[in-house]
A protein has these predicted regions:
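Acidic ATP/Mg2+-coordinating residue in the GHKL
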Residues: 58
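Short conserved segment of the HATPase_c
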Residues: 63-76
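Conserved micro-motifs of the catalytic ATP-binding
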Residues: 10, 14-17
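Short alpha-helical Gxxx[C/S/T] motif in the catalytic ATP-binding
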Residues: 91, 95
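Short helix-loop "hinge" at the ATP-lid/N-box region of the Bergerat-fold HATPase_c
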Residues: 33-34
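Conserved glycine-rich
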Residues: 103-104
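Short beta-strand/loop element within the Bergerat-fold HATPase_c
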Residues: 41-51
Length: 127
């Protein structure tokens, strides 16, 4: 059993994108956050510093610094203590490919034992 608090701040924003593919990317990112967060929180919000950026932040195990440069490579699974987790190394690769095709961006910051932040740079129109 996991004890995770999901915090979502409703966004008063319209995203100019292909909904199907953006949902796929969000599902992949949230799946990883849930997989690698034993307890704590997952927080989804628009960045106050970059209002066109959606942030998915978790308090999971984090990603080792040596793995960060390669996490978007096809088939790369990393080795930061996740041997018990099943991974094909295809999810983040697909996320980057999709985001680039949609003219969006994706980047990740992470610290071992603290958690991970995924930044999705989106074209937006404020309502």
């Amino acid at each position: 059993n996991k004890k995770i608090q999901l915090r979502y701040h409703p966004l008063n924003t319209t995203v100019l994108t292909d909904e199907k593919w953006l949902v796929f990317v969000l599902e992949q990112i949230l799946s990883n956050a849930l997989k690698y967060t034993k307890s704590g929180s997952i927080h989804i919000y628009l960045s106050p510093d970059a209002p066109k950026t959606l942030v998915i932040e978790d308090t999971g195990i984090g990603i080792a610094p040596e793995d960060l440069p390669r996490i978007f490579e096809k088939g790369y699974t990393g080795c930061n203590g996740r041997a018990d987790k099943r991974s094909t190394g295809i999810g983040l690769y697909l996320c980057r490919q999709i985001m680039e095709k949609l003219s969006h961006t994706i980047r990740i910051e992470s610290e071992m034992g603290v958690g991970t932040k995924v930044y999705l740079g989106l074209d937006t129109v404020s309502l």
